[in-house]
Each structure stands twice: as C-alpha cells, then as structure tokens.
C-alpha cells in the first residue's frame, strides 16, 4: 500500500451512501494513527482532504474525510441526517425534533456514524490502533462536539473544533442548543470532559451579518458572532 489519494462509497448502514476520501501510509502497522476530517457547510470534503494531505503525506497516518452530501444529509451538523425526519420510536425527547439514538432511529441518527466508518477501516486495512483523532471546521466543528457528547463510541483520543457558528452547551435547554432530557449518561459526560480537545477561533470573525451565520433566537443568545459564541 502506498500513501495516495483514494475514494470509496460507504454503504454499510441504513443511512444514505456517502463518499469517503482517504489516504494510506506505505505500511499500516501497530503505530499507524487515524485522523478524521469533517467538512463544513460547503460540503467540500475533497478540498479539506487535499489540504490536510499536505501535512499527513509521508507520515504514518490514515487520513479519512467523509462527505455528508447536502441533498442527502441536510442536518448533519446536528447529528441527524435530516431533522425533518428525526423523530423515532422510543425517544422520550421527540419534542425537540431530534432522535439521536441509532437503535431507535437507525436511518437518521448520525451518533454511530464515525464509529461505523472507523470499524470498517479497521477491518479493511487491519488497523491495530483502537482510537482516532478528529478535526471539524465550521459545520464540521458542530458535528464533532455533538458527536463527542452523544456518539456511540468513546474512542476519540483528541479532537479539534474550529470556527463553529453555534454550539450545544451543557445547559438545561432544548437540543440542539442544550442537553435538556437528552440521552447523555453520567459516564458519557465524564468521558466527554476528559477528551483532549481544542477550540479554534478567528479573532476577527466578528461579523454579525455573515451570510453563513445562524441567527435564530437560540444562536443569538450565545453571542452576536462566531467569536463571541
């Protein structure tokens, strides 16, 4: 195996198929690390992959960049395929319009997505490492911190969240702005707070009229711009 640009279609779940861009080192061994890169609202997974490949090329890293297509995954940043279809059976918090538990809503929940992709790559390429690192930008940053909160695995070793437009806080308010009545256990919360993570912000990202900035009531309560939030 050589370090190179690769693409596959992932379909081993009940959600819509996705394209995954990835690269492999010369040899996959016990020291090989795995890095996920989650795109923003532009959905340009290939360009994110290309930029990161400049840094991972010739290193013992498997770089993985899934693409959550806008037509098929309009609400990926909130950890569901489509919030209009998010209600599922057995969810006590359906009033929020979201059902994040895959056992109750397997075709729409993304809280098992990274885990399933990681397991697939581990099996396909005989990866011995059982943890991964993950980076998300903008909408991808929203996806990452929500995945850390509600995901179905605890294998993220490190996480970087860059320039999210708004956040889910550990507050007693409705999801996706808070965690009121959401399925997060005490053990999961302890793990979430123990993950080595970094939040990246641009100190000049202060335009309250940015066309890509969410400006509903819940978002505005977090601040007037990305930097404040």
Predicted regions and their residues:
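Active-site glycine-rich loops that stabilize anionic/oxyanionic intermediates
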Residues: 39-43
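A conserved amphipathic alpha-helix that caps or lines the catalytic cleft of carbohydrate-
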Residues: 56, 118, 122, 147-148
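Conserved acidic catalytic loop of the alpha/beta-hydrolase fold
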Residues: 22, 113-130
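A domain-start/cap signature at the N-terminus of enzymes
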Residues: 1-34, 44-47, 55-62, 86, ...
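The serine-hydrolase catalytic nucleophile loop
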Residues: 45-52, 68, 211
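Conserved alpha/beta-hydrolase
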Residues: 59-76
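The feature captures the conserved acid-bearing segment of alpha/beta-hydrolase catalytic domains
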Residues: 157-229
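Short acidic, low-complexity segments enriched in Ser/Thr/Gly/Pro
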Residues: 77-98, 130
């Amino acid at each position: 195996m050589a370090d190179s640009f690769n693409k596959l279609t992932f379909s081993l779940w009940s959600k819509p198929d996705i394209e995954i861009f990835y690269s492999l080192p010369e040899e996959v061994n016990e020291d090989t690390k795995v890095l996920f890169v989650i795109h923003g609202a532009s959905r340009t997974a290939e360009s994110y992959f290309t930029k990161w490949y400049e840094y991972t090329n010739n290193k013992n890293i498997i770089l993985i960049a899934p693409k959550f297509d806008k037509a098929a995954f309009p609400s990926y940043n909130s950890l569901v395929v489509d919030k209009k279809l998010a209600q599922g059976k057995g969810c006590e918090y359906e009033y929020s319009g979201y059902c994040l538990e895959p056992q109750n809503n397997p075709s729409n929940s993304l809280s098992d997505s990274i885990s399933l992709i990681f397991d697939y790559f581990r099996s396909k390429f005989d990866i011995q490492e059982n943890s991964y690192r993950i980076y998300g930008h903008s909408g991808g940053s929203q996806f990452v911190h929500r995945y850390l909160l509600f995901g179905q695995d605890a294998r993220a070793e490190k996480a970087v969240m860059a320039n999210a437009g708004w956040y889910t806080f550990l507050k007693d308010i409705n999801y996706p702005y808070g965690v009121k009545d959401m399925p997060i256990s005490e053990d999961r919360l302890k793990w979430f707070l123990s993950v080595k993570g970094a939040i990246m912000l641009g100190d000049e990202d202060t335009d309250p009229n940015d066309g890509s900035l969410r400006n509903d009531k819940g978002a505005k309560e977090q601040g007037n711009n990305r930097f404040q939030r």
